[in-house]
Amino acid sequence: MTSSIPTSGEALPHYVSTAPFDPSLIEPNTSGMAAFSKASQLRLMWWQFRQHKVAVWSGAFLVLLYLSILISEFLAPYNLHTRNIEHIYAPPQGIHLFNDGKFVGPFVYGREMTLDMDNLRRVYRDVPTDIQPLRFFCKGDTYHFWGMFEGKTHLVCPAEGGEMFLLGTDRLGRDVLSRIIYGARISLTIGLLGVAMSFVLGIVIGGLAGYRGGTFDLIVQRIIEVLQSIPSIPLWLALAAIMPVTWSPILVYLGITIILGMLDWTGLARAVRSKLLALREEDYVLAAQLMGAGTPRIIGRHLIPGFMSHLIASATLTIPGMILGETALSFLGLGLRPPITSWGILLTEARSVSVIALYPWLLIPTIPVVLVILAFNFFGDGLRDAADPFR
C-alpha cells in the first residue's frame, strides 16, 4: 500500500481547525460564568463575604449600632444627667404583657421603697396593683439634638407620673440604660477616629519605607521595633497621665484619640512596607517612573490600591483594640472624665467589690463592650477572608 507524499507547500492533514478558538466549546458559557468573568474586585469580595454568614450578621449589627448613635437622644428614655433621687440604686424592672391572665400590653409595675434598718440598704418591691403602661413615641425629658435644636420626643417613656428603669439606676439615681445609649456615642467613635489616624500614619510611613528603602527604611524599622517592644497598656497609662487635669472634656477626648492612634500604626506600617517591597519592582511602577510620576503619585495611585482591601480588613480588626484601650483608660480614671460619658466611665461605678455584690446591674455596660468586640472581630475575619486571593 502506497501513500501519497505531500509536495512542498501543501498543508498537512492534521486535525487542526483554522476556525477562531471558542472557549465555550471547552467550558460551559453559563450566565454565572459570564458574570464572574466580568465582575470587579469589589464585587468578587462581596460575593465571597456573603458566604460568611456570621460576618454578615455582625456587619449588620455594627451598622445599626452606628446609626443608633446618631439618634441617641431619641432612643434614650431619659436625659444623660436626669436624676431620680427616690430611686437610688434601684434594680432593673421587667416588662410585662399580661396581668392576672389578661393581656394589658407592655407595662411595668410600680415600686415602693423601704429602708432595711439592719444594713441601711434601700429595698424596692413591686406593687402588683400599680400598673404603669409604657408609652411609645412620646413626650419626655427635653434634650438638644446634637446641640442644634430642642426636642422632647422619645422612643419609649414611662407612664404619666411613673418611672421606668429597665436596667436599674446608679448611685445618683440615673438610668443605666440611657447612660449606656449615650456612652455608645463616645466609645464607638473614638475607635473609628483612632483607626483613621493610625491608618494614615501606617500607610504614609510604611509606604515611604517600603518604596524608598535604604537608611530611611532601616530607621523606621528600628522605631517600630522599639514601640512594639513596649507593653501597650503601661504606655497608654503613661501618656494619659501627662494630660493636664485642666483640659476640657473635648480636649481630653481628642488627646485619648491621638494617643490610641499614634501607638497603633506600627503593625499596619509593616504590612504596607512588605507589600511595597514586592510591588516596587513591577513593570508598571517602572513605566510610571519613566513617565515622570513622583513618589506620592506612584505610592498613592499605583501601589496602595492594589492591596487596599487587605488594609481595610486589617484596620477593621484594630478597632476593637481601640475600644478596649479607651474603656481601660477610663475605667482606671486616666482617660475620659465626667461629664463625658462612655462605657469605660460607666464601669468605674463597679470598681468596688461591695458595689458589685450589692448592685450587680452596674456591670451591664460590659455586655455591649463584649458584643461590639466580637462583632468587629467576626466582621474583620469575613473581610480578611474575602480579600484573600488565595482562598
Label each region the model flagged.
Residues 1-199, 203, 208, 299, ...:
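Gly/Trp-centered helix-boundary motif
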Residues 169-391:
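Alpha-helical transmembrane segments of integral membrane proteins
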